[in-house]
Amino acid sequence: MVLSVPVIALGATLGTATSILALCGVTCLCRHMHPKKGLLPRDREPDPEKARPGVLQAAQQFNVKKSTEPVQPRPLLKFPDIYGPRPAVTAPEVINYADYTLGTTEESAAPASPQAQSDSRLKRQVTEELFILPQNGVVEDVCVMETWNPEKAASWNQAPKLHFRLDYDQKKAELFVTSLEAVTSDHEGGCDCYIQGSVAVKTGSVEAQTALKKRQLHTTWEEGLTLPLGEEELPTATLTLTLRTCDRFSRHSVIGELRLGLNGASVPLGTAQWGELKTTAKEPSAGTGEVLLSISYLPAANRLLVVLIKAKNLHSNQSKELLGKDVSVKVTLKHQAQKLKKKQTKRAKHKINPVWNEMIMFELPDDLLQASSVELEVLGQGEEGPSCELGRCSLGLHASGSERSHWEEMLKNPRRQIAMWHQLHL
């Protein structure tokens, strides 16, 4: 037992020494077999023969040669062809057209070098599609006009025309106006157009109109007009066909009208024909501006909504004194001649075209709507002093023109906002 401790210590020492020697031997053997494995990649010398292809190293070696010689363009470089319109007028400034040739007064020069010939070919290809400047170096203004269109030019100056056909049904006692077509000039205003027909007799008049169609130079309607007319009234009746336009603000205007006697002598029945519309001269407006507003009625809530949007071209005798001051609109609800309620919009700075965008609401029973009306007054007022009336208008069945038609459209289309322009008067 006493000798076992030294023996164990000696064995452990010998084992440790043997392990260290074995590790050193293995390390030396590895260094001998791979002498460059321990070096960094940048310290290794590339071996072209043993190099293997990889992602960052190609399998083939390329040699790049640097040269300081200038790169010259190819002598046969072609420019893209430029196509232009054929000139409407013969002019010496325009060349390279099949029917026009340009003579040269200079004699041909001596043959040049190949490089000069290449440059001349390039210059010739470019200048064939360009303009020749005058010799004095001054470039005159060239007026470019679009292609002349005879049909468009004729339609600009011609009067509007209407195509129609008249037929009469004796059993139904009705007059039919079919094959409706309209030809108008390009400068007529309005986005949409329609035809309104009316027959006037001794006892009164009846009227009908077509649907709105997108206004074009040549507009065609697939539908016709049906007007009730007794056979005994046919010889004395007068038919009026009116071509009207309607813009995006629901403003209606007349392009022209055609009046025909139905006695059978001037207008044969059953024959299609063209008629020239007579345009009425526009009288100068005596108003003081226009106002744009929309109205609608809510039957479930018994409410009348009036939206004051804006006005334009406001002027009066006192307009110079009211510049820079406030402008408002007073809205009055009336039933027949009795005033029910009145409200006023906010004030806007007095300009030629003021904008409000304000809604005014009135409570009005449905049974009173037919006999009611709305009166508008545009007022201008300064910081001190009384207000001045700039214009007024009244909407209702008692009115005429656009003021009456606006109220009728509101009655026909409940719960729908309908906007129109109205002329102001003093």
UniProtKB/Swiss-Prot annotation:
InterPro entries: C2_dom, C2_domain_sf, Syt13_C2B
GO molecular function, one term: SNARE binding
Cytoplasmic-side segments: 30-426
Membrane topology summary: Single-pass membrane protein
Subcellular location: Membrane
Record keywords, A-Z: Membrane, Repeat, Transmembrane, Transmembrane helix
Gene3D superfamilies: C2 domain
Keyword check for Lyase: no
Tissue and organ expression note: Expressed in brain, spleen, kidney and testis.
UniProt GO cellular component terms: axon; dense core granule; exocytic vesicle; plasma membrane; synaptic vesicle membrane
Transmembrane regions listed in the UniProt entry: 7-29
UniProt keyword annotation of Transmembrane present: yes
Vesicular topological domain: 1-6
Residue span(s) of domain C2: 158-275, 287-422
UniProt-listed Pfam families: C2
GO biological process, one term: calcium-dependent activation of synaptic vesicle fusion
UniProt family annotation: Belongs to the synaptotagmin family.
Protein task: May be involved in transport vesicle docking to the plasma membrane.
Domain writeup: The first C2 domain/C2A does not mediate Ca(2+)-dependent phospholipid binding. The second C2 domain/C2B domain binds phospholipids regardless of whether calcium is present.
Subunit structure and binding partners: Interacts with NRXN1.
Protein name, per record: Synaptotagmin-13
